[in-house]
Structures are given as C-alpha cells and as structure tokens.
Swiss-Prot record:
Official protein name in the record: Trans-cinnamate:CoA ligase, peroxisomal
Induction: Circadian-regulation with peak levels occurring late afternoon (e.g. 3 to 7 pm). Repressed by ethylene, especially in senescing flowers.
PANTHER family tied to this protein: ACYL-ACTIVATING ENZYME (PTHR43859), BUTYRATE--COA LIGASE AAE11, PEROXISOMAL-LIKE (PTHR43859:SF35)
Role, per record: Involved in the biosynthesis of floral volatile benzenoid/phenylpropanoid (FVBP) scent (e.g. benzylbenzoate, phenylethylbenzoate, and methylbenzoate). Catalyzes the formation of CoA esters of cinnamic acid, and, with lower efficiency, of 4-coumaric acid and caffeic acid.
Subunit architecture: Monomer.
InterPro entries cross-referenced by the UniProt entry: AMP-bd_C (IPR025110), AMP-bd_C_sf (IPR045851), AMP-binding_CS (IPR020845), AMP-dep_synth/lig_dom (IPR000873), ANL_N_sf (IPR042099)
Length: 570
C-alpha cells in the first residue's frame, strides 16, 4: 500500500480559496453580499475577485508579497480575502482602531507592497505613511531603508465620495480593469504557503505578525462552521471586524456554506437591530461588549427579534448575568475561545441535550465556559507549563491552555525568540490560564500575566470581575494585582458605574463579600469614567497595574509572595 503514489487526482493542496470556487459553481444566483443598497451574487463575487487578482498581478505583485488593507466591514475587505491570495500574495488586514504609529510599525514590519485604504481612514493612513518615512521613525526601528507601499483608495461602494485624486488608483477601478477571463488554476503549489499575516493586539508590547498557511486557514474555517453547526444558506451579519482573525475565518466560512454576508460600516445598536430584522439575519459574532451596546439601546433603536439569532461570542468571558439578559432579547449564545495564533475558533461550548432540563441560570453558567476542542484540532490540554504535566479534571487546578494541530500558525514573522517561547515539546502555549471540569469542558480563568498571587493562593481576576458585574450599578469592571505587605498581592478593582451617584467603594466591597471568599475580595475600588483599552477592545491591564501600585500598602520588611505553578516563561 505504501507504494501507491500521490497524484493530481488524489492529493490537492488545501486552501479556503476553493470555497469561493464551489460557491460560484453551486450557488451562482444566491445573494453573496448585501451592503446598504448594493447586492451581489456568488457568481458576481467570484468574477470580481478574479478580476481584482489579475489587476494585482498587473501591478507587479508576486508570490508572498504582502498586501495590506485598512478598511471596515465593507465588500472590498471581504473580496480581498480571496483576491489577494488568488494573486499569490499574502493579505494583511490592519486594525482600523490603531493609531498611526502602530499602523506605521505594521507596514514597516510586514514590508507591505500595497495599502488599500477606505476613504474614512485616509487621514490616519497619511499620518502613518509620514511617520514611516520620517528620520526619527527609521532610527527608532533600526532600519536603513523603508519602502513606501503604493496606496489604493477604497471609495464607498453604495455612496461614492469621489475624493479620488488624480493618478490615484481606486478599488472599483482595479476590479473593472481586471482580466474578465482570468481563472486561477493551481494557484496554491504548497498548502504550507502563507495566505494571511495578522498582527496581534498585545497589551504589553508591540504587535507580533502571525503567519497562517493555506492549510491552516482551510482547517480553521472548517473548525468554525462545524463547531458552530452552521447550516447552509446562513445570513451572517458582520458585527465582528474582518480584521480580527479574518472574522474568525468566517470570511471564508460564509462562502463554504453558500451564505449571505451582510456588511455594515459601524457596529451600533441601530445598525445591528435594523439589519437583523430587514435581512432576517441568522448568525453573528461579537465580543461581550456588543451585548452591552444592544442592551443599552434606546427604544427607537430597538427592533423586535422574532426568530432567534445565533451569536458566537469570544473575547473576555461574558458574565452569566449578561448571557441571560441578551438571550431574553432573542439571541442564542454560543461561547467559544480562540486566539490569533491558533487561526480562530479553538474551543466551543458545545451544547449537551441534558442541559435543556436545567434552569436558565444554570444554563448560563455552563455557556460561560469555553468548552471543548473543535473537530479539526489535534488536541487541547491544560498543563503545568513548568512540568508540562496535565492538570486534574476537577474544575479547580489551574494551568496553561496548550494546543496542537494543523490550524496553529506557521509562526511569528521575523521573530525567532517569540517562536521559541510559545512552541514547547510539540505544543503551542497560549498564555491563557484555565481549569478542566469533570465533563472535560475548559473554563478560562485568566491570562497568565493577570493571575493575582495572594499569600500563595492564585486568584483569577476574571472571577472577581464577574462577581463585581453582578452589582446592578456596575457597567464594566477590571481587576488587577495591588501590592500588599503581608500577602504580596491583593485584588484592586477598577469600576465603571451607572449614573447612580450613590454607589461607593464600600458598597462594592460589601457586595463582593457576599459573592467571594474573603481573600478574593478587592482591597481597593477605584471608579473610572472609562477603562483603558487596546484597538481591539482589550483592557490594558498593564496600565491598570501601574495605577494600582499607588494604592498598594508597602512594608519593606515583607514584600514577597509565594508563586505557585505559574508558567516559567512569563
């Protein structure tokens, strides 16, 4: 049997680009994209992507060149997920919330040859490019020479602004100028070839470039649509940024299911509610912060949801109270876990039929867990990262989430040191702390660096935050370590409250004493107008830890804490 050879008929490189070809052949007349008053079919989308790919090649884009895009969830961003790799290039979607300096750093590090910019972000892009070519920036980046990417405007498809300057290329112009006969055949020679370059939004350092292979992107897409049990012809609302892990790979996944992409520029309550009712949306993804947007919507912004909308939520673990409230509006929540380095969805809280008999509160508690491994991932475990031994399935012992599978990134671009830190003994170390329950479901407790060590006890900042969020006058909460002379560290809470002016620090502490063991109760509560966050909405806990130092109690005779089973690399 070993002598039977591979050939073109039985071995083909895996790539998510085949999902578009299949959608064109199988669902040609189905609606592929809706954006304001514009609509496309899968036949039109396929042909537009082919034309754009041919135009990119005419601009001397060759294999493995990086093409960056700074744009919201508009049709152009979606189409480039296919057209750019069709041309043999690597797509880099840039977080639109980043400041010009971070955009300049990404453009420099990625060596982008082209930069597609939506008209709303032209000024930000201009500032980034000015920084890119400035002497101070070049010196700070230890660069001898930085090449300027060619800028291509993305005007609004439905309501063009016509701000295109003379001699400046525009997206639709490239689409229409492309070769209508262009048919990408055998565009992927090796499934290990790169398809996208995504930059992490780290809260402690400059972003790192994460490289995915065609094979990894293909399997990650299957992970998401199978783990979510997404059927055919979904109507998917783009409330999740496409720049965030390629929309958790659903940029390719909606094509795989022959669905409809409902594109929106802004994630507002009115946009979400109106598009759900107008287009009969069946699926959407978001971070828990979007739940707050929907719950706080004004009466004129709301619409009645008559058919349940399946919502996959990731990011920070949502409080069980928040899940309960959002489901009362007509949303059905599925909790997942994923990180940029793993190519999207890694764990999903797969529903068990016996849970149907439980109370709504118990169901919400179960849904708040991150769940079990998706199908196409080889293995997931929670390990003591010093010994690499698995933790017991008792729901109490914390360890680091470790992953293994073909959907894991190729590695960090131009960063051997970081690669050596995260790949260990055949596993990828995520930096996330979790427990495993008796039923095998994982529950994230914290980031490794955010664990609070108080008198030798490991305290999950997320558990403390969830307890605080149960208070009716609290909108958001973040908990970090604060120095303490006896215990080493104790929890310090930063809270955003409602307009109730009566709530005091003592009220939060009394509330926490009812919800938590004494050693987990915050010793200080600081009220803020808003929490410091990164461009992707992650709380900047490093900044909060610096603030908490000023609230700490110091005693030079005793400032040590016993660290138990924390990852050695942190």
């Amino acid at each position: 049997m070993d002598e039977l050879p591979k050939c073109g008929a039985n071995y083909v490189p895996l790539t998510p680009l085949t999902f578009l070809t299949r959608a064109f052949k199988s669902y040609a007349n189905r609606t592929s994209i809706i954006y304001a008053g514009a609509r496309f079919t899968w036949e039109q989308t396929y042909k537009r992507c082919c034309r754009l790919a041919s135009s990119l090649q005419s601009l001397n884009i060759v294999k493995n060149d990086v093409v960056s895009v700074l744009a919201p969830n508009v049709p152009a961003t979606y189409e480039m997920h296919f057209a750019v790799p069709m041309a043999g290039a690597v797509l880099n979607t840039i977080n639109t919330r980043l400041d010009p300096m971070n955009i300049a750093i990404i453009l420099k590090h990625s060596e982008a040859k082209l930069l597609f910019v939506d008209y709303e972000y032209l000024e930000k892009a201009r500032k980034a490019l000015e920084l890119l070519m400035s002497t101070n920036f070049i010196t700070a980046q230890n660069s001898k020479k930085i090449s300027m990417p060619q800028v291509i405007l993305i005007d609004d498809l439905y309501s063009p602004t016509r701000i295109q300057q003379q001699d400046q290329l525009e997206y639709e112009q490239l689409v229409h100028q492309g070769n209508p006969e262009y048919a990408p055949e055998n565009i992927v020679d090796d499934e290990w070839d790169p398809i996208v370059l995504n930059y992490t939004s780290g809260t402690t350092s400059e972003p790192k470039g994460v490289v995915y292979s065609h094979r990894g992107a293909f399997l990650s897409t299957l992970n998401t649509i199978m783990g979510w049990e997404m059927g055919t012809e979904p109507v998917y609302l783009w409330s999740l940024p496409m720049f965030h892990i390629n929309g958790w790979t659903l940029t390719w996944g909606i094509a795989a299911r022959g669905g409809t992409n409902v594109c929106i520029r802004n994630t507002t309550a009115q946009e979400i509610y109106s598009n759900i009712t107008l287009h009969k949306v069946t699926h959407m993804c978001c971070a828990p912060t979007v739940f707050n947007i929907l719950l706080e919507a004004k009466p004129h912004e709301r619409r009645e949801i008559t058919t349940p909308v399946q919502v996959m939520v990731g990011g920070a673990p949502p409080p069980t109270t928040l899940i309960g409230k959002i489901e009362e509006l007509g949303f059905h929540v599925v909790h997942c876990y994923g990180i940029t380095e793993a190519g999207g969805t890694t764990l999903v809280c797969e529903w068990q039929s016996e849970w149907n008999k439980l109370s709504r509160e118990d169901q919400a508690n179960l849904k708040a867990r991150q769940g079990i491994s998706v199908l196409a991932l080889e293995d997931v475990d929670v390990k003591n990262s010093k010994t690499m031994q698995s933790v017991p399935h008792n729901g109490k012992t914390m360890g680091e989430i470790c992953l293994r599978g073909s959907s894991i990134m190729k590695g960090y671009f131009k960063n051997d040191k970081a690669n050596s830190q995260v790949f260990k003994n055949g596993w990828f170390l995520t930096g996330d702390v979790a427990v495993i329950h008796q039923d095998g479901y994982l529950e994230i407790k914290d980031r490794c660096k955010d664990i609070i060590i108080s008198g030798g006890e490991n305290i999950s900042s997320i558990e403390v935050e969830n307890a605080i969020l149960k208070h009716p006058s609290v909108i958001e909460a973040a908990v970090v370590a604060m120095p303490h002379p006896r215990w080493g560290e104790t929890p310090c809470a930063f809270v955003i409250k409602t307009k109730n002016p009566e709530i005091k620090e003592a009220d939060i502490i009394v509330h926490c004493k009812k919800e938590l063991p004494g050693f987990m109760v915050p010793k200080h509560v600081q009220f803020l107008e808003e929490l410091p966050k990164t461009g992707t909405g992650k709380v900047k806990k490093l900044q909060l830890r610096e603030m908490a130092k000023s609230f700490g109690i110091f005693d030079n005779a005793n400032q040590t804490s016993q660290i138990l089973d924390l990852p050695a690399r942190l």
